[in-house]
Amino acid sequence: MCACMTKEALLEVCKQNGLYRTASLNDKLYCNFKGFSQIACLEDYVNLKALFLEGNVLETLEGLPPLADLKCLYVQQNCIWKISGLEAVPGLDTLNISNNQLTKLEGLACCPALRTLIATHNHLVTLDSVAHLAECKALQTLDLQNNELEDPGIVDILKQIPDLRCLYLKGNPVVSNIKNYRKVLVTSIPSLTYLDDRPVFDNERKIAQAWLEGGLEGERAMRNQLKEEEEERSRKNHEFMMQMRAAGWRERRKRMGLPDGDTDPALDDMSDGEYEFDEEPEELVEARQRLAAYTARPGEEEPAELASARQGLARDGKPIQEGAWGSGAAAESDSAIYLQSVKAAQAELDVVRQQQPRQLPTAQVLIEELDEPCGGKAPAADEGSTPPALSPMTSPSGSEGQGGEGVAAAKKGAASGAAEGISAAVDINDLD
């Protein structure tokens, strides 16, 4: 729903964002996502430096009052189809007009101090739609990503911006239409320090310039030259550090009253034998030489000594055979060998289990379990009372005192029956 930008609405915006009620005291104003359809009633905000109008329904920038101090204007995500009305803000430094309906960039020459222009996700297609950029002489950062630019001639327009440093063109067909896109842009715009997704370093610029002048051969020569220069710098740094260390040792020897020298004084007390290392066994040297005669296994790391030995054979002109380290078929992997050993161990275990007889409880064990009271301990009895196991029992004939004998007989009978059942079970199993 559209809303009007009135003084009352602007005052409410100031309240919501903790700004001053007095308009002239504010140097920024957040009017984003308010549904405003036009710019109005900003005359009292004469000291604004940043104005946020993102996410409204503006169709034009007309209505901006003279704001001499305004540096940043954010009007992305609106419905603007034409740039106009910027004459009132000649000191504008940054303009974000992305995600609008622009088909042409214009009306920017009235902002001679404009250094950053962000115009992504619009409808810029032809060279004419961006030709006006040649008049923005102070422009340093230009973002035209995700438009519809496809003519390689845009490079000629960008060349006319003398101080262009950051350029973003990803998301446009022109990136694919320009052969050797990055090299062309780097050599065409000498001031460029950042292109799309990464910086432009000095070495890249030198390589691109060599490619422009000498093609691929010139590029290779420049890469080799840069590599040699880097190695030379590293060598000089190493020599300088060694000289500093030797000078420090000489100074230390002088303070300690030791003879002159370039070595660490702490090593003077060590004998020459402490620096000697045991020689490698002849068997190890011979094995390494044999292995070095074969190429490395694909996908496996090999010891550094083996790689060095193979390089030595190559330098001596000796042949290096293709294939595995050993003779014959390629050796099995460690995982396959381990799996086979596990299967063999499992098979042996299964055979042993089949040969072992079944272990069943004996009758004596069952009798002992029946004699053992519940819980492994006899229940505590009160003084003067008869234990439950020895309490008198009345037989069918009326006699007393024979209950314990009856219980014992019952246990033995149960045990005998259990033993007979176990024997029968064993016989049946033997038949199986």
From Swiss-Prot:
Q: Where is this region: Disordered?
A: 297-332, 368-432
User: Which stretches are LRR repeats?
Assistant: 47-68, 69-90, 91-112, 113-134, 138-159
Q: Which InterPro entries match?
A: Cilia_flagella_integrity (IPR050576), Leu-rich_rpt (IPR001611), LRR_dom_sf (IPR032675)
Superkingdom of the source species = Eukaryota
Q: Which Pfam families match?
A: LRR_9
Q: Where is the composition biased (Low complexity)?
A: 323-332, 407-425
Q: Where is the LRRCT domain?
A: 173-211
Residues annotated as coiled-coil are 212-243
SMART domains membership? LRR_SD22 (SM00365)
Q: Which GO terms describe its biological process?
A: axonemal dynein complex assembly; cilium movement; positive regulation of cilium-dependent cell motility; protein localization to organelle; regulation of cilium beat frequency
Question: What GO CC annotations are associated with the protein?
Answer: cell body; cilium; cytoplasm; cytoskeleton
Q: What happens when the gene is disrupted?
A: Absence of outer row dynein and a reduced flagellar beat. Axonemal outer row dynein assembly is prevented by blocking association of heavy chains and intermediate chains in the cytoplasm.
Which key words are in the record? Cell projection, Cilium, Coiled coil, Cytoplasm, Cytoskeleton, Leucine-rich repeat, Repeat
Q: Where in the cell is it found?
A: Cytoplasm, Cytoskeleton, Cilium axoneme
Function (record text): Cilium-specific protein required for cilia structures. Axonemal dynein-associated protein that participates in a structural link between inner and outer row dyneins.
The record's family statement is:
Belongs to the DNAAF1 family.
What does the annotation say about its assembly with partners? Interacts with both outer row and I1 inner row dyneins.
The protein in question is named Leucine-rich repeat-containing protein ODA7
Q: What organism is listed for this UniProt entry?
A: Chlamydomonas reinhardtii
